[in-house]
């Protein structure tokens, strides 16, 4: 498990903000944690052909979007051509966080043939990223993501970019992450410290694996070292040992 510690997302009602690695005053350890995550993924890419990733979690508010954006930025810093895709078609937020404008075309518009992929892509020059918003919320997101057009779009993105990161809804809420996970090379599972019960996390990981998704590993967010030493009945007090798909892609959760 990769640990992103001692940094909590600021909230203002429903208007959450991202904690970017480029923000002024960002702790050194926070930035280095993403570099460590990048190093591990680079190692996997060399032996497992990992270039497309879906980022998900058990429940909302586990900082998965924060992880998706910062991982994309960290990958781009190393000279890679990176695309960040907002696949939360129900409640898209990345376009607001990344200031890509309102009512922008995106995934849903591409899949419904309202525009081409190139027309929907946004260049974020300050972040050295290419961003694909979620687009207009459709009435049937899961069905739309299950269409052959989605697989075709993923394949096109894979050809255009070195790394493609998909930010997907939580596993316990909808099936979208599992659907997307079948199209990509692997999934990164985000676990917020002292938040989702361990049984729920186990169940979410198992659901992904049962659906044929290769879970590469997990990222622990909002970790409090002092609190962890006192013990907890929640997920962060467990050690998640993923075999990086070298064995049978099983997640061993041990106390």
Regions found by a protein language model. Give the residues of each.
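P-loop NTP-binding module
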Residues: 1-255
């Amino acid at each position: 498990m990769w640990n992103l510690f001692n940094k909590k997302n600021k909230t203002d009602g429903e208007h959450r903000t991202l904690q970017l690695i480029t923000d002024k005053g960002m702790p050194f350890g926070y930035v280095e944690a993403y570099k460590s995550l990048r190093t591990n993924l680079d190692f996997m890419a060399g032996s497992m052909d990992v270039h497309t990733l879906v980022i998900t979690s058990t429940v909302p508010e586990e900082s998965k979007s924060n992880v998706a954006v910062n991982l994309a930025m960290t990958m781009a810093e190393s000279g890679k051509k990176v695309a960040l895709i907002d696949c939360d078609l129900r409640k898209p937020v990345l376009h607001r966080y990344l200031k890509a404008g309102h009512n922008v075309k995106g995934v849903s518009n591409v899949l419904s043939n309202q525009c081409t992929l190139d027309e929907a892509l946004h260049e974020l020059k300050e972040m050295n990223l290419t961003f694909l918003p979620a687009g207009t919320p459709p009435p049937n997101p899961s069905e739309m993501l299950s269409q052959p057009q989605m697989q075709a779009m993923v394949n096109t993105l894979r050809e255009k970019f070195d790394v493609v990161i998909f930010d997907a809804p939580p596993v316990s809420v909808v099936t979208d992450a599992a659907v997307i996970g079948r199209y990509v090379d692997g999934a990164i599972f985000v676990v917020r410290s002292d938040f989702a019960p361990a049984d729920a996390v186990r169940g979410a990981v198992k659901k992904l694996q049962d659906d044929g998704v290769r879970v590469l590993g997990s990222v622990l967010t909002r970790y409090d070292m002092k609190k962890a030493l006192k013990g907890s009945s929640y997920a962060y007090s467990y050690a998640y040992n993923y075999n990086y798909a070298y064995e049978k892609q099983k997640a061993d959760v041990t106390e």
